[in-house]
């Protein structure tokens, strides 16, 4: 007969009718009983042929393909002019006085941040924008390209101009070395020569459609300038096959010519006369061409002609355009859906390329990307705006893996000890928090994103319209991209983007100027930065509380009026150092703070309502007596694990699920086990703040017996059979709690001190979690433990009670602790203010 739920509750001692604890509790440690209960509840599932369930509610498991939803009406979020002031440290010192070593160390980490991995893989530009939405490829391309352009305009990205220079918008930092008079001087000994930088150059193309013929004729690679064929010439490829294996994509493409999939180099002898003809036509039409000289590494000086931006797009009909987009203007439409119909909608499509306000030196940056990008909804509650996802996963796996620094995440008890109080609370919203922290330009070559341009992107997605080297630039190849889908997509995009369609159709390479979200270093840096800022605020206003985790920043004060004045002062301080706050999203919580998924009040901590609703919904949909895929179990455990500390039996109740996930087996919920879990999560108990106190109750055990010291009283007992020492120590602690009711118990066992009961026999772990709920433990060495003698059966010998004070810990979360306004004179060997010694004490 299967075990019913009432019997199971009684077995776990969750009912008041249970017998003496000293007799009942050791029984739960029996392996045979645990095995029989597991079999009754079907917790050890044999391999069965019943098909697994791969979906429970919103949780999906193995073999499930979730099709991402693309929103063609996504809005690109706007980014404020984010510029963290370089003199932030001096401004903080004006605000609060000399900074502590902890604060200085953290602020220096991000001014600027550095990221130099040992190995970096570079990918072709075609992988710059991921084909995440195959049915909406063109829409996704332009929306992503618009997002990248917005980030560049906001000063968050660098734009690669040449191999060793980049441009950006916004305010400049001192570590960003400006190019002197438009030239980058490189070391000739290394074979680089001197590279003359012209304002119209770009990461891939030296100039749009109206560039000079000389520039079209020569193509630069790492081997110097290579001669190139004319736009419509039919010469041979020359040495392209031999060079391609080494160079892949040239450092700079000729003016306006879209690079093909592999690049194309040509022999000096195979150049066409059409280049010289174009040169003559353009020089007649544009007398304002400016000329600059380029010295190559091979010693040749080549004149490069560059145009003022105003002359772009205003060429005569006789000109042969080398810009893929503008070439359609001079061709006959191939069909009703020819792209030439769209190109002829405007006379002036604007420049092929834009350049930033500042041009700086960079380390050698190849014409490649190191990560792909795609768009998703901003969050589950905001599907109108998009969010850019950057995939730099190469730094988290394989040979290019980087070991990220670890940092403190406040656990539930530390958070409760720190924030559970009778203060009034509000939370601040930092706009684009990650994009506040500047990166050193030397990190740019490792964090490259970009796009290959529309023709190559479309060609990659369409097998019928691939651009081949031998037909590159021919009219037949030009119209091979024309299709109804592309035509309709571009026509719709033209209504929103207008002439930016032309700009976005060109290739671009961008490097991060601020820390990106897709790299494991970024959360660490953000946590260090916000903790240092909160430390400064705490010391400036010692009667208040400022706390942060990542970009969540909360302020607490004793009254609402006090909180409002604090809010004004802190907001002004944050704005003065360049931190942008979204004041519209400031939330005032009253006395119950909502933070990190918890509600924290003077009574303790509970999970937020939306998490409780999710749990109820999960239990409604969990099937009984059906094997559930272990991947689905992972999602269920993730949800239930968050709220486990608020239940009677805690994490031990979930151990059968953990075991099935570890074994990668399916799990079957029996009616009794599901009812047990359901009841556990329907009644949640708050986690209370620990109080300081003096330990008066001690417990100790040997494999055969237990002993207690409660004040001046001593007790002892024996076990029916010898038990493992950790199990015996846990039983002794449970007896001490049940007999004395004390919430402060001294023990010499580290496993009991850790309060993790998942390694004990399952039934014992569940029962002990409920008995010891809310109990704090203090470590006492065995030699000084007053319960040591009773546990060995000797009651006659009395050891005096220790004066053992307990101080609640806030872990390593108290980095913003009360600190002296000037550094104290510590011994020379102490180089930092330990957070353990300067911990903030709750009011």
From Swiss-Prot:
Sites where the protein binds Mg(2+): 429, 551-552
Domain Reverse transcriptase: 357-600
Bias (Basic residues): 239-249
Signal peptide annotation: none
Catalytic reaction annotation: DNA(n) + a 2'-deoxyribonucleoside 5'-triphosphate = DNA(n+1) + diphosphate; Endonucleolytic cleavage to 5'-phosphomonoester
One annotated GO molecular function: DNA binding
Residue numbers spanned by region Terminal protein domain (TP): 1-177
Regulation: Activated by host HSP70 and HSP40 in vitro to be able to bind the epsilon loop of the pgRNA. Because deletion of the RNase H region renders the protein partly chaperone-independent, the chaperones may be needed indirectly to relieve occlusion of the RNA-binding site by this domain. Inhibited by several reverse-transcriptase inhibitors: Lamivudine, Adefovir and Entecavir.
Miscellaneous note of the record: Hepadnaviral virions contain probably just one P protein molecule per particle.
Protein name according to UniProt: Protein P
Native source species: Hepatitis B virus genotype F2 subtype adw4q (isolate Senegal/9203) (HBV-F)
This protein's encoding gene: P
């Amino acid at each position: 007969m299967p075990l019913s739920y009432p019997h199971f509750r009684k077995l776990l001692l969750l009912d008041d009718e249970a017998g003496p604890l000293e007799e009942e509790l050791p029984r739960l440690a029996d392996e045979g009983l645990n095995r029989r209960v597991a079999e009754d509840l079907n917790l050890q599932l044999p391999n069965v042929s019943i098909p697994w369930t791969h979906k429970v509610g919103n949780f999906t498991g193995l073999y499930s393909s979730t099709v991402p939803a693309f929103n063609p009406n996504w809005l690109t979020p706007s980014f404020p002019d984010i510029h963290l002031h370089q003199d932030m440290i001096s401004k903080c010192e004006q605000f609060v006085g000399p900074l502590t070593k902890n604060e200085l160390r953290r602020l220096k980490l991000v001014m600027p941040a550095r990221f130099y991995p040992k190995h970096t893989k570079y990918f072709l530009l075609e992988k710059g924008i991921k084909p995440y939405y195959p049915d909406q490829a063109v829409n996704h391309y332009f929306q992503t390209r618009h997002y990248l352009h917005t980030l560049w305009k906001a000063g968050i990205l660098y734009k690669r101009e040449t191999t060793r220079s980049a441009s950006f918008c916004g305010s400049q930092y001192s570590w960003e070395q400006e190019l002197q008079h438009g030239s980058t001087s490189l070391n000739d000994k290394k074979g680089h020569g001197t590279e003359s930088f012209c304002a119209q150059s770009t990461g891939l193309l030296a100039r749009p459609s109206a560039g000079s013929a000389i520039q079209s004729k020569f193509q630069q690679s790492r081997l110097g300038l290579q001669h190139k064929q004319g736009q419509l010439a039919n010469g041979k490829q020359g040495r392209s096959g031999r060079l391609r294996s080494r160079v892949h994509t040239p450092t700079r493409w000729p003016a306006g010519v879209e690079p093909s999939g592999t690049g194309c180099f040509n022999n000096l002898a195979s150049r066409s006369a059409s280049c010289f003809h174009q040169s003559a036509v353009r020089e007649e039409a544009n007398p304002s061409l400016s000329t600059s000289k380029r010295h190559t590494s091979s010693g040749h000086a080549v004149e490069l002609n560059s145009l003022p931006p105003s002359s772009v797009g205003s060429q005569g009909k006789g000109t042969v355009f080398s810009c893929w987009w503008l070439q359609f203007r001079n061709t006959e439409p191939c069909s009703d859906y020819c792209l030439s119909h769209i190109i002829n909608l405007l006379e002036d499509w604007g420049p092929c390329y834009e350049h930033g306000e500042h041009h700086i030196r960079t380390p050698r940056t190849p014409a490649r990307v190191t990560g792909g990008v795609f768009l998703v909804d901003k969050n589950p509650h905001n599907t109108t705006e998009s969010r850019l996802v950057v995939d730099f996963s190469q730094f988290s796996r394989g040979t290019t893996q980087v070991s990220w620094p670890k940092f403190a995440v406040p656990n539930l008890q530390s958070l409760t000890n720190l924030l559970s109080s009778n203060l009034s609370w509000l939370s601040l919203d930092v706009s684009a928090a990650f994009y506040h922290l500047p990166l050193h330009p030397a990190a740019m070559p490792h964090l490259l994103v970009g796009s290959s341009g529309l023709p190559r992107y479309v060609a990659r997605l369409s097998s019928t319209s691939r651009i081949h080297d031998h037909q590159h630039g021919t009219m037949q190849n030009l119209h091979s991209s024309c299709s109804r889908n592309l035509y309709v997509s571009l026509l719709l995009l033209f209504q929103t983007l207008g002439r930016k369609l032309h700009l976005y159709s060109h290739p671009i390479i961008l490097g991060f100027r601020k820390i990106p979200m897709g790299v494991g270093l970024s959360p660490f840096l953000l946590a260090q930065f916000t903790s240092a800022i909160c430390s400064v605020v705490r010391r400036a206003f010692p009667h208040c509380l400022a706390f942060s985790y990542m970009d969540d920043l909360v302020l607490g004060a004793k009254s609402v009026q006090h909180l409002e004045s604090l809010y004004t002062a802190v907001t002004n301080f944050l704005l003065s150092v360049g931190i942008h706050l979204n004041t519209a999203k400031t939330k005032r919580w009253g006395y119950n703070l909502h933070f990190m998924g918890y509600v924290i009040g003077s009574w303790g901590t509970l999970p937020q309502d939306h998490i409780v609703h999710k749990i109820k919904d999960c239990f409604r949909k969990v099937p009984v007596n059906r094997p559930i895929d272990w991947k689905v179990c992972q999602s269920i455990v993730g949800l239930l694990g968050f709220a486990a500390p608020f239940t009677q039996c805690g994490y031990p109740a979930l151990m059968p699920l953990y075991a099935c996930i570890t074994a990668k087996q399916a799990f079957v919920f029996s009616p009794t086990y599901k009812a047990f879990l359901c009841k556990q999560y329907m009644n949640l108990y708050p986690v209370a703040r620990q109080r300081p106190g003096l330990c008066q109750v001690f417990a100790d055990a040997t494999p055969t017996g237990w002993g207690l010291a409660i004040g001046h009283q001593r007790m002892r007992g024996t076990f029916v059979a010898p038990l493992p020492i950790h199990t015996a120590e846990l039983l002794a602690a449970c007896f001490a709690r049940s007999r004395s009711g004390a919430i402060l118990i001294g023990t010499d066992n580290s496993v009991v001190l850790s309060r993790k009961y998942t390694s004990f026999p399952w039934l014992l772990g569940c029962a002990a979690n409920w008995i010891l709920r809310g109990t704090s433990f203090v470590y006492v060495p065995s030699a000084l433990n007053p319960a040591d003698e009773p546990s060995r059966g000797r009651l006659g010998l009395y050891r005096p009670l220790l004066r053992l004070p307990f101080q609640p810990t806030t872990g390593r979360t108290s980095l913003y602790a009360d600190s002296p306004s000037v550094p104290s004179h510590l011994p020379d060997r102490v180089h930092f203010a330990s957070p353990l010694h300067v911990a903030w004490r709750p009011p």
